[in-house]
């Protein structure tokens, strides 16, 4: 079959184009067995390709000289040297034309090896000039990527860029299974191992242009290779490509390089804009100076000539002068106006921004007065100036921007070349380490072998790999031992935790018991002392009474300090921040300690910095206790001296100020070795001081804890025999006080229920209350208390928390759940010796409104009674209404619409309650339950919780078929309805008119 015809696949093959052979050359050659020895085959041989044609003709066409030089017998078998170099034979004896040049010799053919003739440099140049030989070189990209070509194919004359074979380490390397012989990708083979029909060029075309698609026959790429190297190469080809888990960059570009590029570009843009703006500003100033210079030139050099010409009435000269001015740069219009002439040079109505300058023209003849001749008007075209500035600025901006962008790109490329590609390699290495592969070392592909920071990081990563390997081996060895140690330690910690929890529970029980057992008799001692103060006693008995009261107060102070410090160690309290007056607080503390100071002949002095704001907001309770402790110590250790309290402002910021409060005395002082430990618990100045002055040594420790809880610091300065100065610094928020606190109003007589099981405590509390005019009812336990609450309404209920049979919390809940509701809104105060913070929170959570601690103080009792009068309405409102629900309704519906709905509800109640009472009278419990159910749902949906709860309770009793008292329920529902309407009016949800209408 002729080449170039269908089936050959080589008539228009790229190898023919690259070798310089015409496309129709093979078609023009004669067909037949001996046609391969003609001029066409000679041209093919000159081009460096094996000839094509019949086998016998080709063999006959060989010169006799070459046949004699080979000297090989016609055995029909390939020579040993020929077998070692497959693919370079010229087939002879083929019956068909266009045989494959790259196919193994057929059986019976006599293969003759052919060596490529080496040409001298002169011959190569001569052939290049004639156009018969084109040097074939690998393209630069192939040389750069490291492609190589088989020696056999080069000797066969195939083009290098078509028959190249990539290195196995390249990412486009053909992967094959282990044990499979490597074959050239350009040689396609048939099922029996041979090449497809159509010749070697057709086989190359079938293999694809890039030669990476189809594997060739095994004999085409048979090479000698070391077995170990071959095995390593197979392992590299068969191993899957691993991807690190944490990729530093995507693709071949680095995130850091792109980020650097964008930031440099952004900086370049900002710098370019700024530089352009600065340059534009200076150019603008230069243009304005030039305009001013031209105007000054006109003023100094042209006005005199204009005045002379105008005086001489020389119009021609004036026109010439105007044209001269019009030739100045940026002059849009020049006009001369006078009584004789109106001359104009330039546009009559120029467009754009103009700057108009007018110069008056006057002339003074010799010996005469100066006369006004006219006015010269010059219009300067600022738009032209601005256009020139903009064009120049844009040009410089583009130039600088291009330069800086190029610089940024160069820097980013350099950064990628020097840094990010190595970071990518190190990220892959770190990914392998993260996956647990610690066998592969880290190697960087660096052109510059000089060590730098990247090498330091790589060395650190390699050291980390070695350390991880060592640590893994050591960790595996220590794992079992560590597990056993952890188990033993866990068991020990669990036992210690159980013991600590048991000790903490025992401590809490001990403190609660101690507080209750000591405060209860103290309440009787101090209460009786308070009652006996107004009794008719002699002077000696009064002194004994004062001694008794002083001893009781001292015992109470010690108890309070011990319990307070225990609470602080357990969990420091954070009292509520309130608004207070600092001056009033200091005066109250000084007034409290003034009797003790008078006994020691000690004078108290207060100095308050005028710059200190009076109103503050903060933990007034903590501050009061710290001042009381410090002043109490100063008064106790000072005899016939002076105690000075100073308050100064250290700094002030928006909404707060930092204060320094100091308490100085002239007492005994503190030794130097004790100053560092003076704020520790149970620490005093020494054993002699403890024996002489007494005390627990907890006051300063408590003060330090409280100051630290306030965010401040505390310290002391002292000298033995000269006195001490205790100071602390805190920061307080500023507050505006509404005004002076009004004096406490006299409390009207109240109905008080006192529930106390100890007779002495009942007698003390009753005596103190009755002395102020209050009426007191007594109850020993919960039963009589509940009975009294059902019979009458009280203004205040005092409950002891430790009652026989029923605790005070349960009794409070029972009073709140009483059906008649007489005392459901009555204030209930806890009257107990258990005043720990967690207990106080439980009291308030149970529905109590206050706590009175034992021993009972008269001032605390009066303060609580004073709050009762104002708290009762609020408590009644809170018990009758769900304020949160009503506030939500008012926010969604509006005030007027909510008032209308509440009025309709009250009107519906007025209509339905008589029907409900009638159903109860007629014993129609089903109808009564139905009406109560409807009204209860309406009341609950509108926030009348007390009335809704009463109706719900009535519904349950009616459905239970129990005995229902119609008269009691009628009175109760009427009272609940009136209380609900009054609560709505007091809370502002219902006006007077709406309430009356309801």
Swiss-Prot record:
Query: Mind listing the GO biological process terms from this record?
Result: arginine catabolic process
Q: Does the keyword DNA repair apply?
A: no
Skewed-composition ranges (Low complexity): 40-49
Q: Which residues form the HAMP domain?
A: 417-473
In the record, 4-aspartylphosphate modifications are located at 800
Record's InterPro entries? CheY-like_superfamily, HAMP_dom, HATPase_C_sf, His_kinase_dom, HisK_dim/P_dom, HisK_dim/P_sf, HPT_dom_sf, Sensor_dom
Q: What does the UniProt record say this protein does?
A: Member of the two-component regulatory system AruS/AruR, which is involved in the regulation of the arginine transaminase (ATA) pathway in response to exogeneous L-arginine. Probably functions as a sensor kinase that phosphorylates AruR.
The protein here is known as Sensor histidine kinase AruS
State the species of origin. Pseudomonas aeruginosa (strain ATCC 15692 / DSM 22644 / CIP 104116 / JCM 14847 / LMG 12228 / 1C / PRS 101 / PAO1)
